[in-house]
Amino acid sequence: MIINHNLPAMNAHRNMGINLNQGQKAMEKLSSGLRINRAGDDAAGLAISEKMRAQIRGLDQASRNSQDGISLIQTAEGALDEVHSILQRMRELAVQSSNETNVEQDQAALNDEFQQLVEEIERIKDTTQFNTQKLLDDTVDTVQLQVGANSGELIELDLTKVDLSAIHTALAAEDITDHTNAQSAIDAIDEQLKAVSEGRSYLGAMQNRLEHTIKNLDNASENLQAAESRIRDVDMAKEMMEFTRTNILNQASQAMLAQANQQPQAVLQLLR
């Protein structure tokens, strides 16, 4: 019988340390809700999870970018809607002035309103902005929308299709001071109505495209989050079982260590 080395106590102490360490890990996982809290828990899983997280955040931001694109389109489309209304009124004035029952004074009054509406189109062209960017003049030709999590995933919005510069220039050359000029103005306005309609149609198509883009991005983000969760999140029920197991083993180890420490006391019986 030896007393310098108590192997049963040493084994019990070693197992108690192992159980205590496993119990602490289980507590950390249960408190954080994560299976992987540091690289040592699962190095490969952590690398995959972080890559997925980067993609998820990129997809979510791309969705917000697309929403911003829709807001820009709605701003431009709202302005064009008002231009449409103005053109309709201008055409109405031109048709009225074309009627030769109007005297010169009547036509002059009609032309005054006509010219004011031309100036209003110019004002809309010059002041319609989104985040300080002018949308309806020739200041900006295209807007690149980042609609993906990775580089190069872009949608280009062509603002030249809604540029009002040419429309304003064409209308500024018209007047309805007499029958002949009013007839010419009707034809010119019809051309500009067509141009504005085409611009609004383009914006509507782009908005519909972005709405589908957002749905796809949100769906991809949701699926990727589910995949990332399977890698990184802890199974609470399973981990609770592990915590309970290690807790029981730890208590048992403590009890066995106490028993092992009592064994050398038997040596004292030999010395009596």
Curated annotation (Swiss-Prot):
Function: Flagellin is the subunit protein which polymerizes to form the filaments of bacterial flagella.
Name of the gene this protein is made from: hag
Main location: secreted
Family annotation (PANTHER family): FLAGELLIN (PTHR42792:SF2)
TM region positions: none
Gene Ontology, cellular component aspect: bacterial-type flagellum; extracellular region
Alphabetical UniProt keywords: Bacterial flagellum, Secreted
Location in or out of the cell: Secreted; Bacterial flagellum
Similarity comment: family membership: Belongs to the bacterial flagellin family.
Any one GO MF annotation of this record: structural molecule activity
Lineage: Bacteria, Bacillati, Bacillota, Bacilli, Bacillales
Superkingdom of source: Bacteria
SUPFAM superfamilies associated with the record: Phase 1 flagellin (SSF64518)
Matches recorded under InterPro entries: Flagellin (IPR001492), Flagellin_C (IPR046358), Flagellin_C_sub2 (IPR042187), Flagellin_N (IPR001029)
The protein, known as: Flagellin
Name of one Pfam family that matches: Flagellin_C
